[in-house]
Amino acid sequence: MNRKKLAAYGQEFEDDDEEGSSVSKKPTQIHEEIATDEKGKRRFHGAFTGGFSAGYWNTVGSKQGWVPQVFSSSRNERGEQIKQRAEDFMDAEDLGEYGIGNRSIKQTAAFGEGAGQKRKMAWERDTTSISTITQMFEDVVKPVSNSIGVRMLRSMGWREGRGIGLANVKQKQKRGGESSEAQFDREQASKVAPAYEFSNEDALVKQLTPLTGTHGIGYQGLRKTTVLNESYGRTTLALKSGKKNSKGIKGQAFGVGAFEEEDESVYSNYDLSQFDFSLDVAGASEESNLKTQKLVTAFELQPKRLNPRKFYAPPRVPPNFRGDHRPIPMDISKLPQMMKNDVKHMNAEQRAKFLGEDRVNALEIGGKSSKKPTERRSRWDIKANEVEKRDNERGGGEAEEDRDRRQRNRIEFPDEPMRQARFKEFLHYIRRGLPYPQPTDLTVWEWEWEKKEFESKLTSDERGMLPEVQSRAQPLAKTAIAAPIHEMMASKFVKEAGGDLKVGTKDEDKLAAVKMEMFGEKTRQSFDWYPDNLLAKRFNVPHPYPGSDTVGVPALQKTDWKRKDRLADIGGVSATLGLPNTANEIEMRERLLKSRAQRGAEEKKRNQSDDDDEKEYDDKDSDEEEENEAEPNNQKVDKAPKSFFDFIFGDGDGADSDESNSEDEEAEEKERQEILKKREEDLKRRREIVEKKEEENRKRVEKELKELENRDLLRVSKQQEDDDIQIIDETSASSFGPALPPSSKPVLSKTEVLKLLEKNMKKKKKDKKEKEKKKKSKKSKKSKKEKKTKRKHSSSSADDSGDNSDGWEEKK
């Protein structure tokens, strides 16, 4: 029968092929089921399908794996200490509902009215009222740490529940009641520790809280819950469980499958509140616990005071007293007319005398330059002028000589004898009108400071002599004018350069000490050393010569005269001194420099000739030279005869030896005299040659100076005709000495001369740089040519070697 005919309406169901279907009717077992996550991926992998999935598609953390943490530390921001947790190594699935469980923030009973406070009954809660908002905030926030006093007591050994003080109370505490067992325990305890001392028990003092509002006694504010929602009562108390809420993480992470139920924990059925920790025996009397002792106080109130205070009545204010102070101004109109005119033109000292004050000079007052503070004077100090006036009034005045002697020998520095001695010499020099030189044991800075202090200690008469002394200390002429004149005068006079110069006493002492090999203070030399400014700054020491540009030991350094007398330096000196700097003056300087260079060359030649002569004499007789240098004036040496030495050392034979010795001495004296005569003749010849050369140089310089003067006179006549040229500086002969010859050229200013010098220096530098570049380019070209030639030689040698090898092969 055909079934298709039976389906008149709709679509017919397909036939189930029971034979072809392979679906088993048995349910799948638990170990065969596959646990999947939210996304349908397999949750467990690995050994026996018991491990978690390995994160992002079987990787750890992310695509790249764990991202390493960066550690950074600096001075401003120190590196934080990273504390690792188990959650740092877990994936999102481990923290989900199948993992360690969700975390939720829960309220605890530590702060404010939480769950623990709500679970309490009405009679278990605090009796204090929380009607005000401030009290509610105080209850919410509680101090975490105790006060400083409690912490100090705990560190000293105090524990809560015990009294404060020494453990000096001996008493028998009845523990466990009056039973036989308790008595036996107390007897055994007394045998073990008979001298045991019990500390005082702390009796709590109940603090009374004052009522702040207008409510009655025992009033409590309304709670948030209404009366209808109140669930507290006897039934809730009976059903109240002692279980506490679990902390932190819920659920288990390991050991339990996803399709299994969790076993009951053994440790969650019991609570510590179910155990009794008291040691009291059941049925014991509670009277002993109710007994309280009196507080032992170490302070007692004394009825009488040992030193009672005295209280004084306040001063009475007069009835006419006014709080505002109004000074009465001085009425100048009442002064006489003469005094009014004199007051306008008064000096500081005159004003001090007029007002009756002590005579104080500007040095004693101490201006901005003085570093030492002025000494404050009291009204009880007896002044020297007042003492003199009193003595004169009484008629017993001292003589002028005694007074002068007392002022000269006055002691201003009793604690410093060296400074007092210098002050005494300073006074002696000032009274004579001479400047006191700088002591050798003081630096420039120290002497300037001490000099100001000495000047402040002078009297008015002595201070009046200071300007004259200071004017004498200054040079008569400025260095720019005096230096060329000094050079001209030095060129006219010549020093002796022969070997007959007398050696000073110091040099003689040094030579004698060197011969005796006694090296020490006599053979030493002392020089002034100028340190660098940077060195003094590094050692944090004041510079001994402030403001000086010299560095090192100038006495041992070679002076470069050419560098000193450069045109730029000459212009700089004249600019600082304010002298007229003209082209004529520069020409004069150039001529002087040329003459000085010629003189230096001649002196070098002369010294070389002297050295050659000395070498010849040294070869002849070195001992005779030393004796002749010590005695250049042909004086006989006071020397003991040879017979005296022979008699001491045992080499003499009598009269024959004396005669022979006398003959030898006469022959030696004749030889010495001949040598001295030869030396004198040589010296005379040299002097004549030197004098001739110097006369020629002088004549030549004089001619040049005359020519310059004639040229200057011609230029002056032309300048008088020309009105366009202006004279910048006109100096008098009295202020700067004889005037310089006028120049015909237009006068150059200081800045123009310096600019010209700078241009010349720049041109020289450019020329040097160009020359160096040319040299470098030539060297580079030469090196390139050499390299090319070497390459050619190497290639040619290689070709030759190849040809030779071919030839050898052909021969073979």
From Swiss-Prot:
Domain G-patch residue range list: 145-191
Single GO cellular component term: nucleus
Example of a GO biological process term: mRNA processing
Species of origin: Caenorhabditis elegans
Biased composition range(s): Basic and acidic residues: 29-40, 586-609, 669-720
MF terms in GO: RNA binding
Protein name as annotated: G patch domain-containing protein 1 homolog
Region (Disordered): 1-42, 384-416, 584-812
Domain of life: Eukaryota
Residue stretches in coiled coil: none
Biased composition (Basic residues): 761-794
Gene: gpch-1
Compositional bias segments (type: Acidic residues): 610-630, 653-668, 800-812
Cited Pfam families: DUF1604, G-patch
Family from the record: Belongs to the GPATCH1 family.
